[in-house]
Amino acid sequence: MKSFSSCILNSKIEIRCSDRTGIATDNLDELFAYLVSKQEGFNICWDVDVFVAPILKVLSIQQVEDLFNSGRISIGKHTIIYNQGKSLRISLSYKNAASFYWIKQYYQEDEEPSLDDIKVKGEIIITELAKIGINPKKLTSSVAIFENIFDQLNLPTYKDIPVELCKWTWGQKGRAWTEAFKLGHFDMCTDLDINSCFPSIMADLYDTRYGTIVHSKEIPEAADYVFARGMLDTSDYFTPFVYANEYGHLFSPRGKREAILSKQGLDYLKEYDAGTFELQDAFSWVPTRKFKPMHYTVNKIFNQRSGNFSRPVKRIFKGALNGIYGRFYQEFRDGTLGKQVNPIWGFLIEDGARLKIAEYIKNNHLEKDILAINTDGILLEGDYNIESSTKMGEWRIDNKGPALIVSSGTVFFADKKPCQVYYHEAMDMIRCYPEAVEWHKKAERLITIGDALQGWSEELGSLHETSPGFSLIFDHDRYYPSLPQTGGELLNRIFPSQPIDASSLVTAK
């Protein structure tokens, strides 16, 4: 393993390597030849966007734009493949190439170390993974580290699913449940979360190749998976059935709207008397065998998180479990799909998470105390005590304390950092300017390739002062009879809501 750093020195690009070699040149062919020569073992840097910045600075604006748009450009005999925030690959040919990965993603709390210490940190990861038989081919991300293992599972993909069903479920992607029910400041809140929510659902998914998928006007009794299209009508204070308007904005409304429901969703409506559904047609999977191809692997990775591993390796386990879900909806820049795309699995995971939350609220009569829902957790008003579990898919208390809720996407609580602002910072901002409706703080961020195209090419790879912040909004995803007009009002009053009416929304898609 070798670690690298880069900079501009006397108008030349200087690359330093932990093997005590290096180069300083203004000739790109020489530079790339040096980098391509570093093929043996892993090549790592602290931050790949910082590492690549000196190279980007000497490219033409057209070359930078081409690289930004396609992720790939050719310069002389060499090809550059740059996956922003992930990896850099320099090649002369497919086999004659060198890749560079960043490890800051696994050491998020650490300051940038020395070149030698970067190498040590990388070796810690590789050594610990090797002890449990994991020998990654690349370090692009947590999921990439486990790619060989996931590839060996031979999972069902979109190619095994009727095209029309793929269209139905692909259209439902990105509907995680994020909703604020009350706005204001709350002195004591309890945050309940599901341990590894998405992975717990993923572990129990069936391989639909073992059975038949039928399209009909009725649902077969023997069906285990159902994707029912029809007219949904709900009137509850909350609903797990998320709706997207023509602009892709998400709502959980009451009233009638078109929807696609799973079998679990249909059962939820019936068990909790939560609404009605007029069936138009459905795709149903009738199994001949109930096989869970991810069950063993997901449970094994989850259990390894509690082992005697360093913090970065535990972060890799967690990232791999959560990240594999994204592969089921993976689409590349050129429109091609990832090899593990499976939109019915993606749909069942998101849908299952929403229904787990809704069922927990119903079973524990928590409706009146819901403050916010955020994908796999519930923020409740008050000091709640439950028996926290460490098992995958079960509930735990994540944290307790005060919260400030500005909107569905802006909930300041504990160590959460919406808009790059912590709870205590948000409170200080509003207390200093209680009559304001917008607040900002000073911060720094890295100037990236996208910024270069906006005239910031000279600052590429450097830190630039910015002003992240938040503001009161007056267009919410729920109906608020009254809204705070100033920060002071937000701190001193509670603003309850009701579900927005589906009839007021634009046609769903």
Name each model-derived stretch:
Residues A24-K509:
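Conserved acidic
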Residues M1-G22, S196-P199:
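Gly/Thr-rich phosphate-binding beta-strand-loop-beta motif of the actin/hexokinase/Hsp70
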